[in-house]
Amino acid sequence: MFCMKIRVATYNIHKGVSSIRAEPRVLALKQAIGLFNADVVFLQEVQGKHDLKAAKYGAEQLGQKHWPAAAQHEYFAGESRHLHAAYGMNAVYDHGHHGNALLSAFPIANMANHDVSDHAYEQRGILHCVLNTEHGLVHCYVVHLGLFEAGRRRQTQALISAVRESAPDGEPVIIAGDFNDWRNTLSGELRNALGVVEAFDELGTNASLDGIMRTLRRKASMKATINPARTFPSALPFFRLDRIYVRGFKVESAEVMHGSLWAKLSDHAPIVASLTLG
C-alpha cells in the first residue's frame, strides 16, 4: 500500500512589500519560502505586475530592495524545487495586477481561476490547480476571501460549489489561504459541506481525552469549536485568518512560522504542514 508524504505551506506575502517600511522584500521572500522545504506553496497577494515599483526599485544594485522584472510567482519558482507555477489574476489596475499563486514540485495538469469578487472594491479569486503526483491527482485551491463577513459567506458558498464541481469524491483536496475569518465562523461550514479538516484542529483530535470527546461530539452532530492557529498580525499573532484544510490526508504536523524574520516580511505569518496520503 502506497503512502505519499507531502509538505505544504500557505502565505499571504503582502504583495512583496515589507509590512513595516513598505519597501520591497521580494528577494528575502524567495529565500524565506525556500525555508519551508515545502512541495506545494499556496500564496496570496502575489504581484504579477507593478510598473511603479519596477521603475523605482528595478536597479539590481539596490540589493535586497531590488524589484525583479519577472512576475513574483515566476521569480519565486525560478532556480528552486518548485519547477511549476500557476497564477490567478484577481485585482487589475493601471500600473499592474495581483492575485493568488501556487508553486509546486509536481506538474500542474490543469488550472482554473474562479472570480468570487463580491463587490467592485475587492477583487477576490479562488485558484484551482490539479497536481499530477506519482500517486494520482491532488486538487489544490488557493483562497483569499474578502474583508466583510456577508461577502465571505457568499464566497465560501462559491468555494464549496467549486470543489464539489471540480474534485470528484475520493480524490484528495487541499484548500489553503487567507480566509479573513476574523470571528472563526467558516470552518464548521466547510467541514460539513466538503468533509475537510483544518490542519491544527486535526492535530488537536489526536490528543487523548480531548480528541476522544471532540470525535464523539462530531459523530453526535453536536457543535465542536474548531481552533485554527493565530497568524495575524505576524509580529504578534492574534487572529486566526490563515488556514489549511485537507480531505483524504492525515495531518502529521503543522506550525506557524514565528519570529523577527517573518514579522519583517509580511503582515501575515505563514503556516507549514506535513501531510500523509494513503
How would you label these PLM feature ranges?
Residues 1-40, 68, 82-278:
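Active-site regions of metal-assisted phosphoester/phosphodiester hydrolases
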Residues 19-23, 50-68:
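Short, flexible/disordered intra-domain loops and linkers
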Residues 61-62, 73-85:
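Charged, glycine-enriched surface loops/patches
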